[in-house]
Amino acid sequence: YFRAKSNDGYHNQKTGFCSYFLTFEDGARIEIMNIPEMADLPKKIVRTGYSHIAFSVGSIEIVDALTAELKADGYEVISGPRTTGDGYYESCIVAVEDNQIEITV
């Protein structure tokens, strides 16, 4: 999704730690990490601290198509696609570990 390419990942057999880098066309990267011993406490969609990450995809058509693709793959769409009160065209989905992803033009 979001035209990111994943590396082959890293897995430390001794600790169970795993990580993947997602690299985007412009060179930006995000590292996704997991360690089995971490407590998975319930998360609310509205919360303090890290709440969501937004990706600008360039057009209304791409917002619509990507939202439909994610929904078809089983992700929960919690809003949109729509134009917000402050004029942004967006949708929001709930992704891995209940993290919210906002898809904007």
For the regions a protein language model found, what residue spans apply to each?
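Short secondary-structure boundary/capping segments
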Residues: 21-22, 42-45
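Core segments of cupin and vicinal oxygen chelate
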Residues: 1-29
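Short, charged/polar surface micro-motifs in flexible loops or helix N-caps
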Residues: 25-29, 38, 60-61
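Vicinal oxygen chelate
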Residues: 20-23, 30, 67-105
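A short, acidic/glycine-rich surface segment
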Residues: 8, 17, 36-42, 79
